[in-house]
Swiss-Prot record:
The lineage of its organism: Eukaryota, Metazoa, Chordata, Craniata, Vertebrata. This is Myotubularin-related protein 5. InterPro entries: cDENN_dom, dDENN_dom, DENN_C, GRAM, Myotubularin, Myotubularin-like_Pase_dom, PH-like_dom_sf, PH_domain. It comes from the Eukaryota. Residues 91-123, 1067-1116, 1268-1318, 1606-1631, 1723-1757 are annotated as: Disordered. Residues 7-185 form the uDENN domain. Residues 881-969 form the GRAM domain. GO terms for molecular function: guanyl-nucleotide exchange factor activity; protein tyrosine/serine/threonine phosphatase activity. Gene3D superfamilies: 3.30.450.200, 3.40.50.11500, Pleckstrin-homology domain (PH domain)/Phosphotyrosine-binding domain (PTB) (2.30.29.30). It comes from Homo sapiens. Residues 339-440 form the dDENN domain. The gene is SBF1. Residues 1088-1101 have a biased composition (Acidic residues). The keyword Phosphoprotein applies. The modification Phosphothreonine is found at residue 1138.
Length: 1868
């Protein structure tokens, strides 16, 4: 029984003591005046009576009632029922308030819905009303009884009833009611009233009335669920409302939802205004505040605000509320909606039932609570299986094994449940409900008996609803045990009674009368026996064992039974000594141990062997067992939620090996490197589990004790069904019946058990925390956890062990003892903290605890001494036999810098090679060594998996390609030990992820890293491999410091420039023009097969030439013999001018070769000779160059042979220049600055470029289409990878907008091609200038339209670099993706934006090609002119000129545009230490990728193969060759790279030029040759450029683990496999089939294409027959010629040959092509694309415009037509080449003169186009001409390009040839 009310208080308005405008509450009377002993009077109650503040009102308000809740220091709640009414204020109160208000002049707002006194509003005579409050204070929550009782007292006062108030209040204070048990009590206060009080059946269940249902109505399902999760996860929750009763109900409802958990933080349903600062508390709370104070809550950053009146919940951004785990979240939501809105289920029915039964509000309230009760039962199902009974007597001590619970439920990663289990509410839940013998309630029954039903009902909503309604009935019955209740009879005041004038204020009560009544009742209570209802205590049922909240079916472990069998077999082999069998199974076991079941199986199997006394192992067995244990532990988290570490803990202290007599090493010394051992929670859970086992054994009968101890989370075994909780329950039941002595004995036994376990665990912890070598600092560095625990467990402790230990190791004192003591001290502190915690919680006496603190240091010290002997003996063990190191194959001249360091090559993020789910053998991890040479980083080794152990794994990359080096800590795949490692990433798309073997010291690893860094970034370019290679074979250049031996390099370069100047002068004086020597690059010898190649140089007369062979040695250092070979050769081929401007023919040439930059005075990054307009003088170029960045002024680099348009390149414009010129609105002033004159010179220069174009020269500067023939407008291009005849080459309406990426009038096609209308506009610019958009912003167009500025947006070098880094990570990821799938690779590839940059480059290039093809010249001047400019102009030339698509032409293109024009290879490749900070920028690689994309779309247009591009991509960063070193020709000359000393090439030396290497290799193998090469004449390529048309280059993704990268040919080509008959085994012939692993084998070698295979076979057969082997090229040429002849006789060749696709006519007539029309994309499938019925009108127009040569190439004619006249003529080769006899064919049909080596040849050596012939005249014999021939037999053919010298066998023949040629010319 308990008092219904403890205190009655009368509180009235009183003035504020500090004189403020507001009043304050004053307690007028309280009863009883003396505090109850068991319940003192709550302080500050007057604040809660008027939460909004005590204020006077101008009118009488109706009475109000609410219940405030106060919490005392013992967490007991006191309910304060407050009934407030208003009485006329006394004059003194009114006057005081008015004076204060007038003084302060503060206007008070309207608060709480009441109108307050304003200082100016009321007249002095106006009546004010003061509040007065009747308060009941009780520890019981009977709101309705309080409302009725206080209402009765108020009614007696207002209505003036003849009832004594003192008697009523006295009866109220003396009324007692039962606490619980479902009893019913009728009470009367002596005023003719009657009230019935019902107590709930179970006091543990909260009473909610309708509060939960109201809360859901106010806020909705989602908001209430958010508040529910917030309260459970300890967030701050604030309710706002204008109603105090609503606030109280909302808080009550939220607490009712939390059952069975009790909220243990600040709980204030109604917070007074004076206490609002409580909201800033750092602890969680649930508080209600009047909505009038909402403004004061705005600044609270971490408070969740629920506005009950507005129905909103506001969650701050900084607050994260973890949601319920799925599927519980969605299930709960759906059930709640069924309860709250039952009509929702029927809304879509065609025939809904006429009526739906809706629950009453009270019943709905219980249904909602039932939903949450089910939710908690599902969340906490099986929690009793994770309780540890630590003590039973004198009081139960229960602990919860959180990790095991989370692991068993499969919710380790769930944030919500983790926070709930860590919260204070759950701690209270365990201590309250974990007790095994206590009264049970509805929740206990639900968890124990209804779990199976809930799981079965999950997918049946109606069954769930039925269960909810059943639970709701029980909850309702608990609150209302007697449904038929007699009605209350209580006097209420009449309506509007508050408005009646009350004759007098509330009277002062007689304290004596009330006290007397209270005393009388107390005396009666003392005499009567206490009516205590006995609690019905029972054993709490545990319920079924827990299951995962969501069954996760993983397909990876479908065959788990087989995996477990493998584990068992392996362990059996180990213990039976079958080590070879065990070794074979070990990799499979280690893979299986990733699964939980296999790890448990391992622990169980090892446990069985320990029980069989088989724990002492030999060395090999010990190593195997330790390795498997380490593998098990490596995936254990610090929580050990699956109990693996717990199961292994007794085993690691059992398995051992004998090192020597008396010295034994246990397994624990080898498994310490795991984080779980340094986690206090793990040790506590282990300790409590073992204590429970021993406590249980203490009380079991001896026969029952035989059963093995149950494992946490497992069901009890059949032998013993009594769990520790059952035993504890039985003992608690018997405890009162035991004698005092027996009780004391049991308490002593339990304490001894706990104490002995504490000693045992102190030993165990020292085993696993002390390292074998206590002087090693690595243990503590890696066990930062030990130190963190010191600071985490006690915030006052600042000297964390990590800090102190690290400090002691950093200071190399040299005292091992001091360091050892530090390790020992750290471990002692860790163990002592553990002992303190567990012993205090387990109730161990202080004496025992002190004894433990004394023992721990001794335990640690003794163990350290034992370990010293173990460590000493373990060092004497013979080392484990490691695999023999495999030596890598080295290049000639490559030397080892660091010999092999043993490492493990680990799998990275690529799936290939790692086996597993990706399939294939597990080539990685591999065990071997890493070698560092002067050229490469090489790993060679063998897989650790013995099933593939015979394969050699090689992974390497050039040192120069290293882009990132990163230290990592990884676990070695064999021993599972944490080791230091390195991750090396290279720009050749290779990754070495290595873990150093334990035998490799940290010093060796650091030395490797430093040496690698030194080789990667040498201080000078001469220290690179390309320079050091072969230096021993060739005499070295004199070093800089030795001046007596020869001039320094700097002197040499000065002499060189000086000699160049002399040579230039001499050439001008003697009117001799510069001519390049024979075709070679930069000091390389002429290839042998190039001597008779046709050369189109523009020499005037052979007699005026200066042969380079006649130059003196000093002159050979001049520019003329060093630099311009590639450039000049190409310029002469293109007909772009001659060196001397004074030659007779030069005046008619539009361009000339200018030597103005011979000394690199104008621009150091340009070549020495440049092409400029004929009319521009050299002295003007200096001024022009000032307008451009880096002085890179516009120079011509290519001219279209058809449209004669030129392509120019330059750097970006400076501010002054064309931009400044066009921006200026006014004419320049008379005193022009130097910049202005430069701008004028620049304008003249551009005008000269425009004037030099034939089609514009006649137009007097006006840009018209006069003279521009329709032939020039015809398309000579090809789209995509299909040849079409139905397209027109269209230019956009606005070229500038198209190049800038804007779609003007014509949108581009879907596949990336430009728009296609045939739209040449009436007037076009002669010159388009492409520049950066930012640079050309706001520039006006040229009014004369001679040139047009085209601003375009291009990427910068830094964007290329950033994109490349992302591409590297996408193609070669360092670690596996979180969700490995093709989509993740494609997503990361897209994020890199690499293909977008390729798309932009191709798009710009194709548009420039169109402009050039239509006759407009283009100047590309982007950035500084050496990166993106180079990419664009190179691509444009490649697409426009078929010559550059040959091996020779591509080499020339790279030499000219990339090397001579100064692309900064060393800067972009970070070749030296100076460039380290800038990093690698793959500009050239990006260009190669673009070429690769074009090659894919036009496979028949390129002479070279895709491998050639990869080869260049690899070696342009490898620094093996000198070709791609340094940033310009100037630097190469300065270093002496462009010449070689006489005699330097004697003997066999390594190739220094990549081109020389390619030439040598091409003679031996067709690897660089494209068999599909079959070009068309004058073909212009227009590739599609959309990202969807682009492919990822396989150079980025392919790998060959068998031999490493295949680009060092000498290394990649291993010895061929012996033929079958030569194999040594003499058994039956084996199959020659073998498995080809794409990531291991080189597929081109393992599966060569048919042509390569046949060529190899041919060479092999020739060798076997003893014949001299024919070169593959000669064989291939003969085969192609034979194929052409096969199709000639009837013109209908059949595809009977292997090479049918190479002949052009076959390719055109037999292929099926896609043909695209100008509108849309029409598909035309035909056998002859030229006679296609789908050809459009525009296609016909275009076909009509074709040049004759293109038309003739499309069909084959009879022999006579093709060969009008033929015979032998002697022809003089190009400059300095001899006369040679050739077979010439005059072809009238094709209007050309072809010549062949021999009459039978089908491949012509050269062609002279008769359209270019200007005259045929008699010639004169020259040096080297045939001696016996008549002088009149010589004649010359003069073309626009050069003069050809011919000699017939006799005079008639010569005359015949002249007549025939003249006849052809006249016929044309």
């Amino acid at each position: 029984m308990a008092r219904l009310a403890d205190y009655f208080v009368l509180v009235a308005f009183g003035p504020h003591p500090r004189g403020s405008g507001e009043g304050q509450g004053q307690i007028l009377q309280r009863f009883p005046e003396k505090d109850w002993e068991d319940n003192p009077f709550p302080q500050g109650i007057e604040l809660f009576c008027q939460p909004s503040g005590w204020q006077l009102c101008p009118e009488r308000n109706p009475p109000t009632f609410f219940v405030a809740v106060l919490t005392d220091i013992n967490s007991e709640r006191h309910y304060c029922a407050c009934l407030t009414f208003w009485e006329p204020a006394e004059p003194s109160q009114q006057e005081t308030t008015r004076v204060e208000d007038a003084t302060e002049r503060e206007e008070e707002g309207d608060e709480g819905g009441q109108t307050h006194l304003s200082p100016t509003a009321p007249a002095p005579s106006a009546q004010l009303f003061a509040p007065k409050t009747l308060v009941l204070v009780s520890r019981l929550d009977h709101t309705e009884v309080f409302r009725n009782s206080l209402g009765l007292i108020y009614a007696i006062h207002v209505e003036g009833l003849n009832v004594c108030l003192e008697n009523v209040i006295g009866n109220l204070l003396t009324c007692t009611v039962p606490l619980a048990g479902g009893s019913q009590r009728t009470i009367s206060l002596g005023a003719g009233d009657r009230q019935v009080i019902q107590t709930p059946l179970a006091d543990s269940l909260p009473v909610s009335r309708c509060s939960v249902a109201l809360l859901f109505r106010q806020l909705g399902i989602t908001n209430v669920l958010s508040l529910f999760c917030a309260a459970l996860t300890e967030h701050k929750v604030l309710f706002l409302s204008r109603s105090y009763q609503r606030l109280a109900d909302a808080c009550r409802g939220l607490l009712a939802l939390l059952f069975p958990l009790r909220y243990s933080f600040t709980y204030v349903p109604i917070l007074p205004a004076q206490l609002l600062e409580v909201l800033s508390t750092p602890t969680p709370f649930i508080i209600g505040v009047n909505a009038a104070f909402q403004a004061e809550t705005q600044e609270l950053l971490d408070v969740i605000v629920a506005d009950l009146d507005g129905g909103t919940v506001t969650i701050p951004e900084c607050v994260h509320i973890p949601p319920l785990p799925e599927p519980l979240q969605s299930q709960t939501h759906s059930v709640l909606s069924m309860v709250l809105d039952p009509e929702l289920e029927l809304a879509d029915l065609a025939f809904p039932p006429p009526t739906t039964s809706t629950s009453s509000l009270k019943m709905q309230d219980k249904e909602l609570r039932a939903v949450f009760l089910r939710l908690f039962a599902q969340l906490l199902q099986g929690y009793r299986w994770c309780l540890h009974v630590v003590r039973i007597h004198p009081e139960p001590v229960i602990r919860f094994h959180k990790a095991a619970f989370l692991g068993q439920r499969g919710l380790v990663e769930d944030d919500f449940l983790m926070k709930v289990l860590e919260g204070m509410a759950f701690a209270g839940f365990v201590s309250e409900r974990g007790v095994p013998y206590r009264p049970t309630d509805l929740f206990d029954e639900l968890v124990a008996h209804e779990v199976a039903r809930m799981r079965a009902d999950e997918n049946h909503p109606q069954r769930v609803l039925r269960h909810v309604q059943e639970l709701a009935e029980q909850l309702y019955k608990n609150e209302n045990p007697y449904p038929a209740v007699a009605m209350h009879k209580v006097q209420r005041p009449g309506e509007s009674s508050h408005l009646r004038r009350v004759p007098r204020p509330f009277p002062r009560l007689d304290e004596g009368t009330v006290q007397w009544i209270v005393d009388q009742a107390a005396a009666k209570m003392q005499g009567a026996p206490p009516a205590v209802k006995a609690e019905r205590r029972t054993t709490v049922p545990s319920g079924p064992p827990m299951t995962a909240i969501l069954e996760r079916c993983s397909g990876l472990h479908v065959n788990s039974a087989r995996r477990l069998e493998v584990v068992r077999n392996c362990i059996s082999y180990v213990f039976e000594g079958k080590m070879l069998e065990a070794k074979k199974l070990l990799p499979a076991v280690l893979r299986a141990l990733k699964g939980r079941a296999a790890r448990r199986c391992l622990a169980q199997e090892l446990h069985l062997h320990v029980q069989q006394n088989r724990a002492v192992l030999d060395h090999q067995q010990f190593d195997f067992v330790v390795r498997m244990m380490n593998c098990c532990l490596q995936d254990c988290t610090s929580l050990d939620e699956h109990g693996i570490a717990a199961a292994l803990l007794p085993l690691v202290t059992a398995f051992c090996r004998k090192l020597s007599p008396g010295v034994t090493q246990f397994a624990y010394s080898c498994v310490q490197e795991h984080v779980v051992w340094s986690t206090p929670q793990f040790w506590e859970a282990m300790f409590y589990g073992d204590v429970q086992t021993h406590i249980r054994a203490l009380y079991l009968e001896p026969t029952e004790d035989l059963a093995p101890a149950q494992e946490v989370g497992e069901a009890p075994s059949q032998e013993d069904e009594r769990s520790a909780l059952d035993v504890a329950s039985e003992q608690r039941r018997l405890w009162p019946t035991l004698s005092r002595e027996k009780q004391q004995e049991l308490v002593q036994k339990e304490e001894s058990t706990v104490f002995s376990q504490a000693i045992h665990y102190a030993n165990r912890m020292s085993y696993l925390l002390l390292p074998l070598d206590s002087s090693k600092s690595r243990l503590l560095r890696e066990r930062a956890g030990l130190g963190d625990l010191e600071s985490a467990s006690n915030s006052l402790v600042t000297n964390s062990m990590a800090g102190s230990v690290a400090e002691s190791y950093d200071t190399e004192s040299g005292f091992e003892d001091a360091e050892t003591c530090d390790v020992a001290g750290a471990v002692v502190r860790f163990i002592n903290r553990f002992v303190d915690k567990v012993c205090t919680e387990s109730g161990v006496t202080s004496d025992h605890l002190k004894g433990l603190h004394v023992m721990v240091p001794d335990i640690v010290q003794m163990h350290i001494e034992t370990l010293e002997a173990v460590q000493r003996e373990s060092r004497r063990l013979p080392p484990i036999q490691k695999p023999k190191l495999l030596r890598p194959r080295l290049l000639p001249g490559e030397e080892c810098v660091l010999d092999g360091l043993r490492v493990y090559l680990l799998p990275d993020g690529r799936e290939e090679g790692a086996g597993g789910s990706a399939g294939g053998p597990a080539l990685l991890p591999a065990e071997g060594a890493v070698f560092l040479t002067t050229y490469r980083v090489i790993f060679t080794g063998m897989p650790t998996d013995p099933l593939v152990g015979e394969q050699v794994v090689v992974r390497s990359f050039p040192v120069a390609a290293l882009t990132k080096e990163k230290r990592i800590s990884v676990q070695t795949p064999v021993d599972q030990l944490l080791q230091d490692g390195l991750q090396l990433r290279s720009c050749t798309f290779q990754l070495l992820k290595m873990a150093f073997d334990e035998e490799v010291g940290s010093d060796s690893a650091e030395l490797f890293r430093k040496q690698l860094h030194k080789l990667r970034y040498p201080p000078d370019i001469r220290a690179t491999f390309a320079f050091t290679l072969g230096s021993a074979h060739t005499p070295g250049r004199p070093p800089r410091v030795t001046k007596d031996k020869g001039p320094s390099l700097r002197t040499l370069s000065r002499n060189l420039v000086k000699n160049a100047k002399k040579t230039i002068g001499r050439q001008h004086v003697t009117r001799k023009k510069y001519n390049p020597p024979s075709w070679e690059h930069r000091g390389q010898p002429p290839p042998e097969d190039q001597e008779d190649e046709i050369s189109v140089s523009e020499e005037l007369e052979p007699s005026t030439l200066t042969p380079s062979s006649a130059l003196k040695p000093s002159d050979r250092m001049t520019m003329s013999s060093l630099v311009e070979r590639a450039c000049c050769r190409d310029y002469q081929r293109l007909g772009l001018g001659t060196l001397s401007s004074s030659l007779s023919r030069a005046k008619s040439e539009p361009f000339r070769i200018s030597p103005v930059n011979r000394m690199y005075a104008i621009c150091r990054s340009y070549p020495g000779l440049l092409i400029v307009p004929q009319s521009v003088q050299d002295n003007a170029l200096q001024r022009v160059s000032r307008c451009y960045r880096q002085n890179r002024f516009p120079v011509v680099c290519w001219r279209s042979g058809r449209s004669k348009a030129v392509l120019l390149r330059s750097g970006g414009l400076h501010g002054k220049g064309v931009v400044g010129l066009f921006k200026a609105q006014n004419a320049p002033s008379p005193g022009q600055s130097q910049a202005d004159s430069s701008s004028l010179e620049q304008e003249k220069y551009l005008q000269a470029v425009v004037s030099s174009m034939p089609r514009y020269a006649d137009a007097s500067g006006r840009n018209t289409l006069s003279g521009f023939s329709s032939a020039h407008m015809g398309s000579h291009g090809k789209w995509g990878s299909v040849r079409t005849s139905g397209r027109s080459s269209g230019l956009g309406t606005d070229v500038g907008s198209r190049l800038a990426g804007r779609d003007a009038l014509a949108p581009p096609q879907a596949n990336g091609g430009p728009p296609d209308p045939g739209f040449l506009r009436p007037q076009r610019a002669a010159l388009y200038i492409l520049g950066d958009k930012a640079q050309l912003k706001g520039v006006r167009s040229d009014p004369l339209q001679q040139w047009e500025l085209v601003p375009i947006e291009v990427f910068e070098a830094r964007q290329v670099k950033a994109s490349f880094k992302k591409l590297l990570k996408a193609c070669v990821p360092g670690c596996p993706a979180a969700e490995p799938s093709p989509a993740s690779f494609l997503r990361s590839l897209e994020d890199s934006e690499w293909l977008i940059q390729i798309h932009k480059l191709l798009q710009v290039s194709v548009l420039v090609v169109e402009l050039l093809d239509s006759g407009s010249s283009v100047l590309v001047g982007l950035e500084d002119g050496w990166d993106i400019t180079t990419q664009v102009v190179s691509l444009v030339q490649l697409l426009s000129d078929p010559f550059y698509r040959t091996l020779e032409g591509f080499r020339l293109l790279v030499e000219k545009e990339w090397l001579s024009f100064g692309h900064r290879f060393s800067h972009r490749g970070a070749h030296t230490l100076a460039g380290q900070s800038s990093g690698f920028t793959p500009v050239f690689l990006q260009f190669l990728d673009c070429v690769h994309q074009v090659h894919l779309q036009f496979p028949m247009e390129f002479e070279f193969s895709q491998f050639y591009l990869k080869f260049l991509g690899y070696h342009h960063v490898s620094r093996r060759f000198r070709t791609f070193l340094l940033d310009s020709d100037y630097e190469r000359i300065e270093l002496g790279l462009l010449y070689e000393e006489k005699g330097e090439r004697r003997g066999q030396v390594p190739c220094r030029s990549v081109w020389e290497y390619v030439d040598r290799l091409s003679k031996r193998t067709p690897v660089f040759h494209n068999y599909m090469y079959a070009p068309e004449d004058a073909e212009v390529l227009r590739p599609y450029s959309n990202v969807s048309n682009l492919k990822v280059w396989d150079f980025y993704t392919e790998e060959t683990l068998a031999e490493g990268p295949p680009y060092d040919w000498e290394l990649a080509q291993g010895p061929p496999e012996p033929p079958e008959e030569e194999r040594s085994d003499g058994g039956a012939p084996q199959s020659r089939r073998r498995v080809v692993w794409p990531c291991y084998d080189s597929c081109p070698r393992a599966q060569p294409d048919a042509i390569s295979r046949l060529l190899e076979e041919l060479q092999r057969l020739e060798t076997e027959l003893g014949q001299p082997a024919e070169r593959w090229k000669d064989t291939w040429d003969r085969v192609k010629a034979a194929q052409r002849l096969e199709g000639r006789p009837d013109g209908r060749g059949t595809p009977s040959s292997l090479l049918v696709s190479t002949a052009p006519h076959h390719r055109r007539s037999l292929g099926v092509y896609l043909q695209e029309g100008p509108v849309g994309s029409t598909l035309s499938l035909s056998l002859d694309s030229d006679q296609s019925s789908g050809s459009t009108t525009s296609g016909s127009r275009q076909a009509a415009r074709r040049s004759t040569s293109t038309l003739y190439s499309q069909f084959q004619t009879a022999e006579s037509e093709n060969r009008s006249y033929e015979g032998t003529l002697y022809k003089k080769g190009a400059f300095m080449k001899p006369w040679k006899a050739r077979w010439f064919v005059l072809d009238k049909t094709k209007h050309q003169l072809r010549y062949y080596d021999h009459r039978v040849d089908t491949e012509c050596k050269g062609v002279i186009d008769l359209a270019e012939v200007e005259a045929v005249a008699p010639g004169t014999p020259t040096m080297g001409a045939p001696k016996t021939v008549d002088e009149k037999a010589f004649f010359d053919v003069k073309t626009t390009r050069r003069v050809y010298n011919f000699c017939a066998q006799d005079v008639p023949s010569a005359q015949q040839w002249v007549d025939r040629i003249q006849s052809c010319l006249s016929d044309a």
